[in-house]
Amino acid sequence: MTIRSPEPEVKIVVEKDPVKTSFEKWAKPGHFSRTLAKGPSTTTWIWNLHADAHDFDSHTNDLEEVSRKVFSAHFGQLAIIFIWLSGMYFHGARFSNYEAWLGDPTHIKPSAQVVWPIVGQEILNGDVGGGFQGIQITSGFFQIWRASGITSELQLYSTAIGGLIFAALMLFAGWFHYHKAAPKLVWFQDVESMLNHHLAGLLGLGSLAWAGHQVHVSLPINELLDAGIDPKEIPLPHEFILNRDLLAQLFPSFAKGLTPFFTLNWSEYSDFLTFRGGLNPVTGGLWLTDTAHHHLAIAVVFLVAGHMYRTNWGIGHSIKEILEAHKGPFTGEGHKGLYEILTTSWHAQLALNLAMLGSLTIIVAHHMYSMPPYPYLAIDYSTQLSLFTHHMWIGGFTIVGAAAHAAIFMVRDYDPTSQYNNLLDRVLRHRDAIISHLNWACIFLGFHSFGLYIHNDTMSALGRPEDMFSDTAIQLQPIFAQWVQNTHVLAPNLTAPNATASTSLTWGGGDLVAVGGKVALLPISLGTADFLVHHIHAFTIHVTVLILLKGVLFARSSRLIPDKANLGFRFPCDGPGRGGTCQVSAWDHVFLGLFWMYNAISVVIFHFSWKMQSDVWGSLSNQGVVTHITGGNFAQSSITINGWLRDFLWAQAAQVIQSYGSSLSAYGLLFLGAHFVWAFSLMFLFSGRGYWQELIESIVWAHNKLKVAPAIQPRALSIVQGRAVGVAHYLLGGIATTWAFFLARIIAVG
């Protein structure tokens, strides 16, 4: 008799028709909360409605129901993204000069928005070249369309329609997977299956599909565009896909088909899968054959990774086992218990994902200029500045969000009884040592980095330039950064013998790429000025981390308030009769962290903007002489606070301040308006709730006198609401001011 192991049964992981689709319910504001569903009696109701609408934890304690709501909301988010993308492509098709730009990208600027002539607003349509009047755009869409092989506005229309179809699909999926077939909790907690599918499906097959598109569509079309062929003469994408001979004319190895692949002569394919390094001198972008090779390699890596985790077949890794085996000699129980946290707390999961995504976004910001991936991106200075700034802000916000959700996890989901002597418990137990050391590091960095500037300002004021820290007096060279640069310059000869240039021209080595007389990229030398400002970066980043980490580590308890966990994530003070306990909630740490994040990112984007204008961006004469936009003044001017104020903020604000009467005038108005929004925030941040309540009561008295009193009783914002409104306007005003300042400047001079 043979004993067979039981066949693994297919688990039913969805529930049919769990929640009725009800339009009556949707039409009732606050239907998710018994208190809010009663309707407003005071004006606080509308604030609570906004605060709690997406706080699914407050609607129900059922983890499965919360998971389904989050899952469904993700489809809604994707639908919005597809609609937004579709709108971008539609603007490119309907209102843009894309085809003209494609024919002459060095002289014509990208525009995809034309302002209607209402009361003189046609002034906003500037001349972007080729007889086209419109607003110059700085999003980089034209460059990415060129790289993907889009040659006509019809193709943009088609893609826009495709985007809308996908948006509709996503909206349907969001409804279907909540109301018709909702996954059970076990499905959300099946991490191995999720890893396999996300790694192999999204990243693996996604990269493979993109690599395929690049090889069969982008490469041939870009090859012909680079050779100066008129876009209208170039075959359509499907012709390259269906007709191999067309491709073989450009890349001879296509004639051999798949033979080299199966005979392992992969080097035959090196005409379209290259490893060159550096930039294409025609477009100033990375070699598209390099990026196709890159995406193919990424696809292979992730397809392998997507087969590593144990599911129905009993082979492969188990995440729980990996975590529990992860112990060191000094780390107690190690990662034991973390698996349970990450499968039952979506806040913990989100915190990790936000921290990693934010860091990745900041890495993207730095690679977009140093390794410009799309054709003609590097000579479009306005777009370069916009993309860097955008990715830095996004990364900053995302990292603060990581701390916010880590703190929410600590307050709502952390169970101290199941976390004994593992790494999380050990970190929490020596949090005082961590925070006090970090605080010391912040004080040290703050005094020393700022002190170097103050020294320079003082010596400058006393007329003693020889006693300043500068490249021409007392040098503080960033020797470690220079060493890193140098090793990368040597890499092509040593570690990558087939590469013709290093990964980025910024490392050094003397190569300069200019396109149409404009510098695309050249070696960036670092000196005393960079050393000084990098220590300001270190200071602001450490203070941001100090505030956020303190908020997380002290979210549940502190010496001041031992029972903080009972008060929740956000609360104004620990009740009456306990003075000095205000602004200690985890939420308040996020609130304060946002201001320091704003400080940190502001210094970074100011540094980038000035450094690039001074040392990289500019024009190349026929004699080979480079003239930079601000003539290399960064090294000597940015070493004093006064230099930053005078030669960066004031000197470069000339364009936005004098923009009236030109096509940049909208930026002048934005600059003023955003300053106003920023100042408006101070009214919320510097004023107490009682002041407003008193004012409101006297205004209500006047309304009563006139018998026009409202049915909904007006109330001053709560302390937390006031701070939330304050920080929102502070950041919006500050970011929009910077945006207007940057764009008016760089569009005028770039």
Swiss-Prot record:
One of its GO terms (cellular component) is photosystem I. It comes from the Eukaryota. Its EC number is 1.97.1.12. It catalyses: reduced [plastocyanin] + hnu + oxidized [2Fe-2S]-[ferredoxin] = oxidized [plastocyanin] + reduced [2Fe-2S]-[ferredoxin]. It holds the Pfam family PsaA_PsaB. It is found in: Plastid, Chloroplast thylakoid membrane. P700 is a chlorophyll a/chlorophyll a' dimer, A0 is one or more chlorophyll a, A1 is one or both phylloquinones and FX is a shared 4Fe-4S iron-sulfur center. The chain crosses the membrane at residues 70-93, 156-179, 195-219, 291-309, 346-369, 385-411, 433-455, 531-549, 589-610, 664-686, 724-744. Chlorophyll a' binds at residue 675. GO terms for molecular function: 4 iron, 4 sulfur cluster binding; chlorophyll binding; electron transfer activity; magnesium ion binding; oxidoreductase activity. Chlorophyll a binds at residues 683, 691. Keywords: 4Fe-4S, Chlorophyll, Chloroplast, Chromophore, Electron transport, Iron, Iron-sulfur, Magnesium, Membrane, Metal-binding, Oxidoreductase, Photosynthesis, Photosystem I, Plastid, Thylakoid, Transmembrane, Transmembrane helix, Transport. Phylloquinone binds at residue 692. Signal peptide: none annotated. InterPro entries: PSI_PsaA, PSI_PsaA/B, PSI_PsaA/B_CS, PSI_PsaA/B_sf. One of its GO terms (biological process) is photosynthesis. It is a multi-pass membrane protein. [4Fe-4S] cluster binds at residues 573, 582. Disulfide bonds: none annotated. The PsaA/B heterodimer binds the P700 chlorophyll special pair and subsequent electron acceptors. PSI consists of a core antenna complex that captures photons, and an electron transfer chain that converts photonic excitation into a charge separation. The eukaryotic PSI reaction center is composed of at least 11 subunits. PsaA and PsaB bind P700, the primary electron donor of photosystem I (PSI), as well as the electron acceptors A0, A1 and FX. PSI is a plastocyanin-ferredoxin oxidoreductase, converting photonic excitation into a charge separation, which transfers an electron from the donor P700 chlorophyll pair to the spectroscopically characterized acceptors A0, A1, FX, FA and FB in turn. Oxidized P700 is reduced on the lumenal side of the thylakoid membrane by plastocyanin. This is Photosystem I P700 chlorophyll a apoprotein A1. It comes from Anthoceros angustus (Hornwort).
